[in-house]
Structures are given as structure tokens and as C-alpha cells.
């Protein structure tokens, strides 16, 4: 009897210790994500020289088209048996939407440095969201990323895409007729197959907290706004190079 009680007590202690350890790991991961997301990031925006100001005045203000899923954020929803993020990783925000009369919760994770990225590029470009997701979901995500800054006002959704061979194609002429001034940032090459010379490829992001792809793009986007035609740069076999 004594032995049985000892075994039960040991099992209870082990179970409690396991739960305590899991909770500790959860808190640690959350803290690491917070530190990485909000660590001091430097990309100094220096005053333009007279020559640079003159050059920028001679070209049109460019449009930067931004994809959402796996480019700026990653999400999974209720009922996903194998979520693509590590168990216990807290989402940055949770969305509750109704799809086909059924409430669905989306757990959304922001790509590292996305807030800083949007703050910087919004000073250089007119920003446009173009996602193959449904509007009820994409609009809610864009609202969260915009965070009342009014930098993501123009938005296009699945109904603005063309479905070809099971893939959603994004026609940039829907955004603007002058393709010389449009850049699209998207993790899916199929999405911009009609406009490869306007695209900047970026690797898909799911959960890596050390990802710096958005930061790596800032120097290029800074320089690209001075061109008369973005295709003169982006057509140079960029898609054969390493992804950002």
C-alpha cells in the first residue's frame, strides 16, 4: 500500500513538473519573440542630397504591392491538425471571422520587423495590399498591420485575382495601368507570373524568429524608388538569385 501511494505521489509530482516546465518554455518563447520583434533596429533615413532630391522629383512615386500570408504574416486557424508554428508559440493577435456562416479563429504571427518595415517603406512608396485570401480575412489582417496609421488603405483580395490551373494570379494592371512604377513583394512566384519583371521574390516565412528578410530588402527598396522604370532593375534575372 505504501509503495502504491509513493508511486502515485511520484507520478503526480512528475506530471506537475512537466506542466510547470511547459509553462516556463511558453513564457520563454514569448519573451524571445518580443525581444526580437522590438529590438532596436537601425536603418537610418538620412536627408537627401540636392542631387538625390532633384532625381527623385523627376520620377513618379512608386507603388509597392504587398502580399500578406507567408510574406508579412503567417496564420493558422481552428481545426488545423498540424499547425506550422511550434506548439506554445503565442500569436501576435487572434482574428475571429465568420466564413460560410461558421465562426473561425485565426492565430496570426507577424514576420519579424514587419512593423518597422512598413513604417519605413510607407515614407518611400504608396503601399497596396494584394492578397489571394478572402476579403473578410485579408481586410482584418491589413487593419491590424495598419494599426490606425492609414498606410494600407488600398487593398485587393481574392476576387481581384485570376484563377489559372489552381493558382491565383495577381494582375498588377488592376492596381495601376503604368507598370513601370509598380513593385510587388510576394513569396509565391505563381502569383506574379504575369509580371515577373515587377517582382521581388521573398522566401516564405512561417515561424523563424531570427528572420531578417524584410530588413534585408530596405536598401534595395530605398534605391529602387529613384529609377524611372523599376523593370530596368527587376528584370535582370533577380529570380535566379537567392531569396531574401
UniProtKB/Swiss-Prot annotation:
Which catalysed reactions does the entry list for this protein?
O-phospho-L-seryl-[protein] + H2O = L-seryl-[protein] + phosphate; O-phospho-L-threonyl-[protein] + H2O = L-threonyl-[protein] + phosphate
- The protein here is known as CTD nuclear envelope phosphatase 1
Q: How far does the signal peptide extend, from start to end residue?
A: none
What's the Enzyme Commission number for this chain? 3.1.3.16
Q: Which PROSITE patterns match?
A: FCP1 (PS50969)
Instruction: Relay the pH-dependence remark from the record.
Output: Optimum pH is 5.5.
- Spell out the Pfam families in the cross-references: NIF
Give the bilayer topology.
Single-pass membrane protein
Q: Which SUPFAM superfamilies match?
A: HAD-like (SSF56784)
Gene name of the record: CTDNEP1
A GO term for molecular function: phosphoprotein phosphatase activity
Tissue distribution: Muscle specific with lower expression in other metabolic tissues.
What is the species listed in this Swiss-Prot or TrEMBL entry?
Homo sapiens
